[in-house]
């Protein structure tokens, strides 16, 4: 079994990822199409990552063991998605969203990553709206918020009781656009067997075609594991 390093940047909690982004080496736009990225999983996390990376110009391969990305378990989410937009004007902030998320996870989450998620939560909502997700709106046209379990304020964006389904369809539509443009290649009915490591870095995967049973090897300059929560995680 491969042992992977999360490589969370050093520094104070609120500046780890901000400092890292300001100092990390950039990729020349002309070279992006030469870099291959493998995304394992096509739910909300994997689908959105695959579509976004393809939009940025990278060559992306996405794997899922279902017959379609639309069958990902993310469809089961109902309540909504949290973001620190403070539309309700009740004092919400990035820190309050961070605190509620860590506490709601029984303090088991990686705090640096949760803080980064809270920082970009507003951009995630904007991305979903741009993808066509029909969030509930007030009569004036603004996105509606409601209070959800484990939070101090009303910050949950929702689409009736079908939030997961609508978010997944939005990510799927973005993926379909990139597939049509040739930037993203989808591998349905494929199961990842092992991560390939070269010099301590993930450089590909071994996958099995669930239809033919054939074992395949796929190279990637980077590998993203978005294979699901407990029970499906690699």
Predicted segments, located by residue:
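Conserved N-terminal/central alpha/beta ligand/cofactor-binding core
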Residues: 2-20, 24, 65-203, 207-211, ...
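Short, hydrophobic/aliphatic alpha-helical segments
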Residues: 28-29, 33, 58-70
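Core beta-strand elements of the Rossmann-like FAD/NAD(P) dinucleotide-binding domain
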Residues: 32-35, 211-222
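N-terminal Rossmann-like FAD-binding beta1-loop-alpha1 element of flavoenzymes
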Residues: 35-62
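Short glycine-rich, flexible loops that bind phosphorylated cofactors or substrates
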Residues: 47, 214, 232-233
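Glycine-rich loop(s) and the adjacent beta-strand/alpha-helix scaffold that form part
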Residues: 222-234
């Amino acid at each position: 079994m491969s042992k992977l390093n999360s490589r969370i940047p050093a520094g104070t909690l609120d500046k780890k990822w901000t400092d890292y982004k300001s100092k990390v080496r950039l990729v020349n736009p002309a070279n992006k199409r030469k870099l291959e990225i493998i995304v394992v999983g096509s739910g909300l996390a994997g689908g959105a990552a695959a579509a976004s990376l393809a939009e940025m110009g990278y060559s992306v391969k996405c794997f899922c063991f279902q017959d379609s990305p639309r069958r990902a378990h993310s469809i089961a989410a109902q309540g909504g998605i949290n973001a620190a937009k403070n539309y309700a004007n009740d004092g919400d902030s990035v820190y309050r969203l961070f605190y509620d998320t860590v506490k709601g996870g029984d303090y088991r989450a990686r705090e640096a990553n949760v803080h980064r998620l809270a920082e970009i939560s507003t951009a995630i909502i904007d991305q979903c709206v741009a993808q066509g997700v029909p969030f509930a709106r007030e009569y004036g046209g603004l996105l509606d918020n409601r209070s959800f379990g484990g939070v101090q304020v009303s910050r949950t964006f929702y689409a009736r009781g079908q939030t997961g389904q609508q978010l997944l369809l939005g990510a799927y539509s973005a993926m379909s656009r990139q597939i049509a443009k040739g930037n993203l290649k989808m591998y349905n009915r494929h199961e990842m067997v092992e991560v390939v490591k070269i010099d301590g870095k993930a450089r590909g995967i071994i996958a099995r075609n669930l239809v033919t049973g054939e074992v395949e090897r796929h190279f990637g300059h980077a590998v993203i594991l978005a294979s699901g929560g407990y029970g499906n995680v690699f």
